[in-house]
Structures are given as structure tokens and as C-alpha cells.
């Protein structure tokens, strides 16, 4: 069994399901030698980075981690923190995170002893039902497109853009499979695409999965019909012009997120980047679909997930 090190694995997208409690090490990400020794002494073979590349300091930490892995003599596989879109795709009006991701890719190319893959996931499905989570999640609370609590949606343009949605547990399952795959079979670009839709499809999915059952008696034909009446969410389509100006209708649940004095500005920048990336069709994701390599993985169906989230909301109502 391979020894795997997860950098940043105590929160966010990096928490795997494991039968045994993993060992934890506090390391100085500015000290390549220290990290190299920790990796070597523990015979680590695979490094999975779950660092949130939110600024230059964290991006530099991942660069140092790559160098430590390359110098360890034990690490042969590396998965950088990507888990979103192809950062080579141009997104007019936003370069948020782009340089950090490309710098990591360039650093990996300098170390031929490492096998690596860039994993594209799109938007995490986890965001769509928060704070009602049908499956375990460690994703930071933040709302994208749908606010199930306040029954509202905000979509970009006409909503016709391609969208990939996968749950964080789907990503974890595929990473576990990749760890066991021989290095020569690793794709350079990997795709986790549990659900492929257009953004505007979310409106119909919401209506379909928030249905409440009611009976209707047909007097003439003497039949009893069970109808599902879906909830009508408030839906806003932000215009292309507004998005390009950074004027995006905030989902109600995001308002306190944006008001946070430490992270609010970053999340507002993320919101703009997500909407601009949708307009440029950057979510038409490339890569080898891991569902083809690992058909045994049971991924999260968006319809089932939304329905379960809605049912949790109904059950938690006072």
C-alpha cells in the first residue's frame, strides 16, 4: 500500500475518508529541506496538494513542496492543487489564481522523476445545497448559482454555458484510485465530471427536486393522481455587461461571507472569476474522464443530491 501525504489535508477539499487516523506533521513550507526529510523518513510515495492557492505565499509553499518531493528520493507521484478548470483557458477580465496554477505546472515539468496529473473538477456540487449537506463536506461555506436556504438562483448571461458539477467525495474517490494506478498510466490531464449540464438546467432541476406531493381526484375517470409541485425559486440572470463590470447579484447567504474582514474581498473576487469563466466557456473541461478509467466509482447524481438537500431543509424547518 502506497504512503500518501496530503498537504493542507486538515480542512477544505483535502480531507480523505480513511479507516485509520492519519499521522499529522506540522512543517515549515518555506523550508524545502525540512519537508524533503519528512517525506523521505516516512517513505512517502505520493503527494496530494490540497493547499488553497489564494495568494503568492501559499503558491510559493506549493512550489517548495514540489521541490521537496522531487528531492526526497521516495516520492514518484504528485497531484498539485488544481481541482477547478483549465487555467490555460483565457478568461477576459480575470486572471485570479491563473499564474499560481501555471507556475506550479512549470515547476513540475522541471522534475522528470515525478509523475503528475492536473485534475479538472469544475464547480464542487457541495456548494449547491449549503448549509444542508446530504454528504460529508469540508468545503468552505460559499454559495454558487443556488441558495437553497433563501430559495434563489443567480445565473450568468442566458445560462447556456456548459457546467461540470462533482462532489468533493467523488474527487477523493478518484484520487484514491489514481494512487493505485501505475505511473505510466497516469493521464497528464484528468477530468472528474460527475454531472455535465448547462447552467440554466439548474432551474428545472430545482423545480423537479423540490416537489411536494399532493393528491388530485379525477371525478370523471375516478383516478387518484399524485402530482409533484416544485418550488419556484427566485431566478436572476445577470447580463454579460453587468458581469464584465463586476456587478453581480449576490446570493443572500453570501452576504455575510463577503462582509468578512479577512476573506470577504477574496470571495468577491472568486464570484467575479466564476461568472467570467462561465461567459468564456472555460467550464467545457478537457482531460481524460476518470469515469472511463475507474467505472467502479459511484459518483454523486445532481438530482438525487439536490432532492436530499431540499428534504434536509424541510426536516430542519422550525
From Swiss-Prot:
The gene is swnN. This is Oxidoreductase swnN. GO terms for molecular function: oxidoreductase activity. Keywords: NADP, Oxidoreductase. Belongs to the NmrA-type oxidoreductase family. Isoflavone reductase subfamily. Its EC number is 1.3.1.-. SUPFAM superfamilies: NAD(P)-binding Rossmann-fold domains (SSF51735). It comes from Arthroderma benhamiae (strain ATCC MYA-4681 / CBS 112371) (Trichophyton mentagrophytes). Aminotransferase; part of the gene cluster that mediates the biosynthesis of swainsonine (SW), a cytotoxic fungal alkaloid and a potential cancer therapy drug. Swainsonine production occurs via a multibranched pathway and is dispensable for fungal colonization of plants and infection of insect hosts. The first step of swainsonine biosynthesis is the production of the precursor pipecolic acid (PA) via conversion of L-lysine (Lys) to 1-piperideine-6-carboxylate (P6C) by the aminotransferase swnA, the latter being further reduced to PA by the reductase swnR. Pathway: Mycotoxin biosynthesis. The keyword NADP applies. InterPro entries: NAD(P)-bd_dom_sf (IPR036291), NmrA/Isoflavone_reductase-like (IPR051609).
